[in-house]
């Protein structure tokens, strides 16, 4: 899982992730947006579920973050297509709408993001 932090011409931090994990970057850019209070809530949520079978969820405007003791899932809220029939041989492209990673890797990304926000 490769990623980079950039600032655009307006000073906004943009996060980009490698293929297969793009949705994590979209989630950070759309939902987190430099909100340190939200970062604190997510880190506290990770501490709550660590070593347990419980889950912690944060539903945002565009994406939902779901975390258990081992794994983080981020998915687009519009990912579910209920009642729609697809033509035979067709399927939805959801590579940029759903991503999984380990909790420790995710927390490392958030730590690096916080550091980048404070430093640059």
UniProtKB/Swiss-Prot annotation:
Disulfide links within the chain: none
Superkingdom of the organism of origin: Bacteria
InterPro entries for the chain: UPF0231
Assigned protein family: Belongs to the UPF0231 family.
Protein's UniProt name: UPF0231 protein Spro_4007
